[in-house]
């Protein structure tokens, strides 16, 4: 195979970090393979099918890789009231609120299923109009619902659960996928594989000039928050979370020098000033202190005047780390407190004590933190 088209399926506008790392991984190993990234989130709904068709017609890919990030309906973010309506429908004491919530819920269900149908239509478009192209699909949403979605995708489409670097490389080279987390439908038969060794993160960095050349829409993210990954995996066992299933429970760390190199490239070449660590948790535990500390120290040493954030367990913040976080430019933080009851937290296997969470917030305040701690 000589060409790959990556298609980031529609979701809220968020920097498509996954496909950028995939493209860079392949480029470093197969520099002769042509690649292109298409972000469908940046097109109006009515133009997305044409965008896929035009990109495939112009680029003539041998392999089309779809990245499906979001599928959930209850998204507790600004502008999405699904969760509020669900609570009103089940628990509101006012009957009128329940009636209103029921109609709103039907509308949201319609939008939800319409979104799924639309996302599925793009692989089908490729299968029908460009039948010689091999289709692959992955991402968080697909990984979570792979058994259901593979039934609705074109036969022969290769689904990847979790990480896709090694799987894509093997498809390009014509190797077997038996040691990868793949799923494939052939008629009524479903084939699956199990991953052997996960991808090596020490080689995972971004050649930004190359990325800029294969991602024409990058300008839409100038001034936006840019995703950077410092580690993969999550050691916790929260009852509602899929990160350990998607990335594994063993935490794998990128060298701090490479993490900050990513930040520095975007800072100097794209003018980026806001960054989001896409890790399941930036501080996964005490064993993460050396890496986190070195990353923040390197940001300071390189005089990168940025604002950064990510998912943070404030229960793991020490007074020393809090000072370093503030000095290096930490912005608003999202903290998954979930409940103010320790009993509930224990039942959900959250793995932290409320007292320690409060301590971390206090350390940040004492260090001069001026941002917001957003509880969810």
Predicted regions span which residues?
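Structural motif
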Residues: 136-140, 311, 374
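Conserved beta-strand segments of the P-loop GTPase G domain that flank and frequently precede/overlap
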Residues: 66-67, 374-376
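Acidic, low-complexity intrinsically disordered segments
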Residues: 1-262, 267-271
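Catalytic metal-binding/acid-base residues of hydrolase active sites
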Residues: 141-142, 281, 376
């Amino acid at each position: 195979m000589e060409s790959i088209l990556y298609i980031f399926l529609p979701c809220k506008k968020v920097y498509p970090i996954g496909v950028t790392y995939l493209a860079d991984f392949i480029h470093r190993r197969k520099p002769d393979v042509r690649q292109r990234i298409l972000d469908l989130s940046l097109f109006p709904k009515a133009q997305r099918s044409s965008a896929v068709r035009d990109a495939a017609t112009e680029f003539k890919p041998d392999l089309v890789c779809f990245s499906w990030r979001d599928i959930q309906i209850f998204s507790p973010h600004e502008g999405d009231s699904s969760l509020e309506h669900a609570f009103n429908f089940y628990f509101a004491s006012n009957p009128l609120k329940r009636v209103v919530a029921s109609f709103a819920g039907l509308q949201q269900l319609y939008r939800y299923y319409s979104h799924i149908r639309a996302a599925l239509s793009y692989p089908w478009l490729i299968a029908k109009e460009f039948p010689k192209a091999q289709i692959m699909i992955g991402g968080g949403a697909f990984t979570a619902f792979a058994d259901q979605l593979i039934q609705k995708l074109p036969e022969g489409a290769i689904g990847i659960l979790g990480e896709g670097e090694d799987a894509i490389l093997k498809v390009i080279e014509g190797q077997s996928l038996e040691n990868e987390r793949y799923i494939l439908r052939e008629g009524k038969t479903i084939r699956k594989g199990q991953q052997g060794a996960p991808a090596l993160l020490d080689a995972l960095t971004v050649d930004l000039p190359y990325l800029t050349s294969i991602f024409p829409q990058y300008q839409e993210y100038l001034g936006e928050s840019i995703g950077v990954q410092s580690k993969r995996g999550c050691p916790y066992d929260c009852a509602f979370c899929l990160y350990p299933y998607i990335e594994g429970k063993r935490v794998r760390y990128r060298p701090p020098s490479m993490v900050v190199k990513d930040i520095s490239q975007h800072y100097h070449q794209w003018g980026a000033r806001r960054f989001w660590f896409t890790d399941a948790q930036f501080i996964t535990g005490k064993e993460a202190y050396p890496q986190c500390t070195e990353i923040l120290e390197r940001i300071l040493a390189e005089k990168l005047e940025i604002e950064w954030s990510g998912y943070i367990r404030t229960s793991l913040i020490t007074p020393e780390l809090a000072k370093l976080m503030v000095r290096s430019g930490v912005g608003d933080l999202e903290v998954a407190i979930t409940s103010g009851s320790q009993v509930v937290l224990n039942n959900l296997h959250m793995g932290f004590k409320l007292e320690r969470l409060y301590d971390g917030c206090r350390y940040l305040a004492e260090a001069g933190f001026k941002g917001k701690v957003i509880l969810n």
